[in-house]
Amino acid sequence: IYTLFVPMDASLAFPCFDQPDLKARFTFAAETPESWTIIGNADAVKTELVNGKRQTQFAETKPISTYLFAFAAGQFRQIAGSKSPTPLRVFVRQSKLKRAEEEWPEVARLTDEGMKHFVEFFGHEFPFTKYDQVLLPGFAYGGMEHAGATFLREDAILFRTTPTQSDKYGRASLVLQELAHQWFGDLVTMRWFDDLWLKEGFANLMAYHAMARIYDPAQMWRRFYQSHKP
């Protein structure tokens, strides 16, 4: 199970103002079946088994918009990523673990390189305590940049058929765009939803900015132009 409150549905789950420039610190605890893993915006600070159930308490978040609060819970398996300077992890269904382990090196490289590039280019450290990527089957979007925990549509990362190079570039664009949103959209947020275009446009641009560092720059900017020209 997972949440998806964008753009203004957090108030369906708890009393709040779904206004993006009104930010709050969230504390969150949940009880799940023992075999489940739960992922939230912040780190889990306490986990214990009580009467066959797993109780998890998360650290308080930094100030975030209500639409960026999220959790996902289920029989996920974790693929460990780098731990410095920001912990990077991927969570995937058990049935897709082998496939994810095959694709993880490339996704990890994109995330690592993107993280370094954005920290350097923005002149600001990663704004949250960790960065998780959770692969979800049938997710409504290609990705959603919840603070510290991006949710990605599973088949956008784990291809169902042999991918073309264009498919791989598309995946790179998605991974890097959602990562860029952690700064522009999550850390810095528009006043109201009529300016969604600003954060989306900027994150898309920055995805290609990072791709131009990772891949051939001329080819990436040509791809950017061809995919965005009127």
PLM regions and their residue ranges:
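Hydrophobic alpha-helical and helix-loop surface patches within well-folded domains
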Residues: 58, 90-230
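Acidic/His-enriched low-complexity segments
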Residues: 1-130, 155
